[in-house]
């Protein structure tokens, strides 16, 4: 077994080994061809809908003599009663009684429950509770009683699984998540909704509920079309939780309850585009700079994510697409410096008049649109001869990413392959520790930012800081670490751009399209506090908003793997985690569903059963697979 070098061991301990003189990250000047316009559009809200088969129900135990008690009902639709009681550090007892048959004269009798203690989430980011089950349960409303020996008011949640054939779909209509802006959620499903409500938890934990309506007056489409709408207005910045609660009857007439939990980060930031026309000026080489004059108010971020489409006109006066442009931009003297290589214009054969279309300026952590503009006139100077003469050549790195920084190119020129100048960086996930067995990899070091909650942008920058000690590196990443690596490669210059001889980015169990578990944990955490806090980048809509601006050439650099639980037989309810099984759709690894671990445009290296997301689940952790680790090690670029 290869021994890691002393330097690798030292650097695996913390971020402190990153050099103090590490240069500030330089953003790339991104661009791409018109055939990527469709992929780079902002996702339709309905495409990011939460699909929920479960219900997270708030319960409040009231004092009753020498104890506290809550009574309610749980509707069973498919012959199985499965639920989890989440009571924090409070000890509760649960009892259920089956629904009485029509005409029965005897009182309901308590039914024995299968019980097991389990963890919703991970050891670092989760909460424990008791999971109960009745595998042969009569359909109908089961009575549930929760009791505590402490005669004080207490509150918690019951998480219940429903029939997967009836799933609630809900989504935010817009991502205008700013203080004072009204936000509407829509909800619909197969079946009949009898009652729908919106339960909102503010950043301080305050709760209020309001009805949702299908009356055509709540941004819900036409009255009576089955789509319900509910609106709230956030009054402060921070993370809000919006829970849709629906009661109804399925197509077989069975009663059901469903909920969906939306993580809604709200910013106290406004940005205004000054003027309604733009101008480009010639810069070094074949570059053009397009300055976006902006004025910010509130808690403005240090930089923004920007996207826009450049259009021109052909010889017949018809509009023709030129290229998309964007990246992470830092304001300079009140302007955001967009950049375009003139060769895109020459390749398209475009001429004036030009326009910048579909402009989006977003915050860098949640991708909340702060400025949107459909079409802006754009003045472009005459193309230089050098640009015209090189227009027939293939699209190269500088056209897609801008000029490579001199320091990065110099470092690569001086480094020797497989020497101290190159490294494989092992990256953990959200709210995690170093999970990779470093001894199974050669010439490798472990990035460690233990038990932290970072946005993809923050995570990427910390990874780059750690890896700046090497002239080139590649990554093997787990969970959110895979998103951070892709984010780094997309938006910033780093040693990833110098990596050669293999796969630049590899990942296992990364929720590239989000996980429903994020919202459930956020709602539970608003009462009990859970781990590292809420991360919107791993929700369905947050992940898809992030992914919308990740270009095809960056995605193609990712080689990814997925896993799920081992299946014993067709009739057994198998799972990785007994708690998350109530929420996630099969197949899943206890944290992310296989379908949402896919990276469109990435290289899918296969799916393995019998492995779960992390330790403490039923099957071994996916990052401990020595065979796959050997394959990733052998194929990694350096």
What are these language model-derived features?
Residues 68-75, 112-141, 149-162:
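Beta-sandwich interaction modules
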Residues 22, 402-638:
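Lipid deacylating catalytic domains
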Residues 89-95, 175-179, 188-197, 295-306:
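A short beta-turn/strand-edge loop motif at beta-sheet boundaries
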Residues 132-134, 138-151, 155-157, 236-252, ...:
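Short, aromatic- and glycine-rich surface loops/edge beta-strands on solvent-exposed regions
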Residues 159-182, 263-284:
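Short, compositionally biased P/S/T/A/G/V-rich stretches that sit at domain boundaries
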Residues 23, 88-90, 120, 179-181, ...:
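Flexible, membrane-associating and regulatory peripheral segments of lipid-active enzymes
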Residues 53-62, 89-128:
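Surface-exposed beta-strand/loop patches in noncatalytic accessory domains
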Residues 116-132, 217-232, 330-345:
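Aromatic sugar-binding surface patches on proteins
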């Amino acid at each position: 077994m290869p021994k890691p070098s002393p330097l690798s061991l030292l650097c695996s301990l913390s971020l402190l080994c990153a050099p103090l003189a590490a240069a500030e990250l330089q953003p790339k000047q991104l661009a791409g061809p018109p055939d990527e316009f469709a992929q780079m559009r902002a996702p339709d809200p309905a495409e990011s809908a939460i699909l929920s088969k479960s219900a997270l129900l708030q319960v409040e135990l009231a004092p009753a003599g020498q104890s506290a008690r809550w009574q309610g009902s749980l509707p069973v639709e498919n012959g199985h009663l499965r639920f989890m009681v989440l009571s924090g550090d409070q000890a509760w007892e649960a009892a259920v009684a089956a629904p009485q048959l029509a005409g029965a004269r005897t009182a309901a009798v308590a039914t024995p429950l299968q019980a097991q203690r389990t963890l919703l989430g991970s050891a670092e980011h989760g909460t424990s509770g008791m999971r109960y089950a009745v595998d042969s349960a009569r359909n109908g409303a089961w009575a549930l009683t929760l009791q505590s020996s402490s005669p004080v008011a207490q509150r918690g949640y019951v998480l219940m699984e429903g029939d997967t054939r009836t799933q609630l779909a809900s989504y935010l209509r817009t991502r205008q998540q700013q203080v004072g802006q009204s936000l509407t959620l829509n909800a619909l499903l197969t079946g009949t909704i009898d009652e729908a409500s919106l339960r909102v938890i503010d950043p301080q934990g305050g709760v209020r509920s309001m009805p949702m309506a299908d009356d055509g007056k709540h941004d819900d489409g036409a009255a009576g079309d089955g789509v319900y709408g509910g609106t709230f207005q956030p009054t402060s910045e921070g993370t809000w939780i919006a829970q849709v609660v629906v009661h109804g009857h399925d197509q077989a007439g069975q009663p059901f309850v469903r909920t969906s939990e939306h993580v809604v980060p709200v910013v106290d930031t406004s940005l205004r585009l000054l003027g309604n026309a733009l101008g480009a000026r010639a810069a070094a080489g074949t570059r053009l700079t397009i300055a976006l004059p902006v004025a910010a108010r509130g808690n403005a971020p240090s930089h923004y994510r920007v996207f826009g489409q450049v259009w021109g006109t052909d010889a017949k006066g018809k509009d023709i697409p030129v290229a998309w442009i964007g990246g992470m931009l830092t304001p300079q003297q009140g302007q955001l410096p967009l950049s375009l290589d003139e060769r895109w214009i020459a390749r398209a054969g475009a001429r004036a008049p030009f326009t910048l279309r579909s402009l989006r300026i977003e915050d860098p952590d949640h991708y909340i649109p702060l400025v949107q503009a459909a079409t802006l006139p754009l003045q472009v100077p005459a193309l230089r001869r050098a640009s015209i003469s090189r227009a027939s050549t293939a699209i190269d790195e500088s056209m897609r990413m801008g000029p490579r920084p001199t320091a990065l190119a110099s470092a690569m020129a001086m480094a020797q392959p497989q020497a101290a100048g190159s490294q494989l960086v092992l990256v953990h996930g959200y709210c995690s520790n170093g999970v990779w067995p470093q001894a199974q990899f050669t010439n490798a070091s472990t990035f460690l930012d233990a038990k932290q909650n970072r946005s993809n942008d923050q995570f990427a920058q910390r990874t780059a800081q750690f890896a700046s000690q090497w002239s080139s590196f590649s990554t093997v990443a787990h969970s959110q670490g895979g998103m951070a690596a892709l984010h780094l490669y997309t938006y910033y210059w780093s040693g990833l751009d110098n990596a050669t001889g293999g796969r630049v980015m590899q990942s296992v169990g990364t929720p590239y399209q989000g996980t429903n578990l994020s919202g459930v944990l956020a709602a539970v955490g608003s009462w009990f506090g859970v781990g590292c806090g809420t991360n919107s980048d791993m929700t369905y809509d947050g992940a898809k908003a992030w992914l919308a601006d990740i270009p095809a050439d960056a995605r193609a650099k990712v080689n990814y793997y997925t896993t799920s639980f081992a299946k014993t037989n067709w009739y057994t309810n198998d799972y990785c985690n007994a708690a998350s099984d109530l929420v996630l759709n099969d197949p899943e690894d206890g944290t992310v569903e296989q379908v949402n671990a896919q990276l469109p445009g990435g290289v899918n290296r296969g799916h393995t059963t019998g492995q779960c997301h992390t330790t403490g689940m039923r099957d071994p952790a996916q990052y401990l697979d020595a065979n796959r680790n050997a394959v990733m090690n052998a194929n990694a670029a350096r």
